[in-house]
Design a protein with these regions (language model features):
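Mid-domain alpha/beta scaffold segments of enzyme catalytic cores
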Residues: 1-265
Length: 265
């Protein structure tokens, strides 16, 4: 297994997924072996934040989480959730508002519900000192309209699992957003366009994430592994370092510092 001399920070892992949670001890052991020092457990529903706390209690120096409603779950969001979210935001283990945003690719929630839910999250973020962990898929126009209205009022923003085009990237960077890159960049078909785009991301705005158990890096040496996990973050780092022709440990240090600064850790 590859190793990193420099500490690594996985800004987005779905550790509540049964593929990872049922093997939690092994997943954490492998993460530490690959020098993963910090992991953000992605919450896609307020219930996830409560469940994540149970895992965080087992690894309080390694794990943190977010609070929010994924656009797929926007139909479940109610205004009454805001007070509960505010209470959760008072805890040190909650490091961002999200995962929230817009996803028009599948529309598990209506566009109306998604826009309402996302707007409420943006309004919440203007009242507290936490950054936002955002999701966008096939919804660039509405997403950017809302970001332009609120981005100057919130602490910080990361567009997680960026897979879009140069126009969207430019819009996000113009608004001061951080960019989260996953194993998508290693996909020779779907992700090849990112090889060019990543050179436009300023070094102080780049972060990396596994989005595990999804998006297994294509440069992972063992084929047919059933699920991705945080320990594989090193393969995303390797790919980016090769694309940018940059020393891996220097790149890792920059990304780690960006992530700690963003999440105030």
């Amino acid at each position: 297994m590859a190793n990193s001399v420099t500490p690594l920070f996985d800004i987005g892992a779905n550790l509540l997924d049964s593929q990872l949670s049922k093997n939690f001890n092994e997943v954490i052991t492998r993460s530490k072996e690959n020098n993963i020092r910090k992991i953000i457990i992605t919450s896609s529903h307020i219930d996830d934040t409560y469940q994540a706390k149970e895992l965080i209690d087992r690894e309080p120096d390694l794990l943190y989480t977010t609070v929010g409603f994924h656009p797929h779950n926007a139909k479940d969001f109610k205004d009454s959730h805001i007070d509960k979210m505010l209470e959760l935001c008072e805890h040190d283990y909650v490091k961002a508002i999200g995962e929230c945003g817009l996803d028009y690719k599948r529309n598990y929630s209506s566009k109306k519900d998604q826009i309402n839910c996302f707007t409420k999250h943006l309004e919440l973020a203007t009242s507290i000192d936490l950054p936002m962990f955002l999701h966008e898929r096939d919804a660039q126009n509405d997403f950017i309209i809302l970001l332009k209205e609120y981005s100057h009022l919130v602490e910080d923003i990361v567009v997680h699992c960026f897979t879009s085009d140069k126009k969207s990237l430019s819009s996000y960077l113009d608004l001061g957003c951080y960019i989260g890159i996953t194993g998508w960049i290693t996909d020779p078909n779907r992700g090849y366009h990112l090889h060019d785009l990543i050179s436009y991301v300023p070094s102080d705005k780049l972060m990396i994430e596994t989005d595990s158990p999804y998006l297994m890096p294509f440069n992972y040496p063992i084929k047919n592994k059933r699920y991705n996990e945080p320990s594989n973050l090193i393969y995303i780092l390797d790919a980016i370092a090769n694309i940018l022709k940059k020393d891996k440990n220097i790149l890792a240090e920059e990304i780690y510092n960006n992530s700690c600064r963003f999440f105030n850790i």
